[in-house]
């Protein structure tokens, strides 16, 4: 790691962020291993899931004889809110890229018993799927060819994440701002 890239002490960071965040707000942080594992475990209670940013420009060429080139970065999502559909404290999540589609779907409920285990039942339930194109965990955004800062993120990636976790007019805090991409 670079000298300027120091780890913010986790306990103090989470204490301050938990005072600032709305009950259903998201805290979205970038990191690579082994840092991302330490970050995740520092607040496993509020950890929700990861995205993977697939970069178009790799890193680690000086060590290519010893390890694979690195073409991704982890994006960790934390929240005081829940990730359940009908929970009143549901974390803000506005999936991007959805397409309207009213389509009748059917699923089989599951039966379970101690002898056979879980298996599909004969009971089928119909529902209407209203959208399609839900995001996958891998986000593909081109790396910047000319960077102001060594860890600079593409504006399009930051815009995607902001639109996913906030509503129009809400405030975003970038407390790890390097080159200021979030403010653009």
Residues of each region from the PLM?
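Core catalytic lobe of class I
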Residues: 1-184
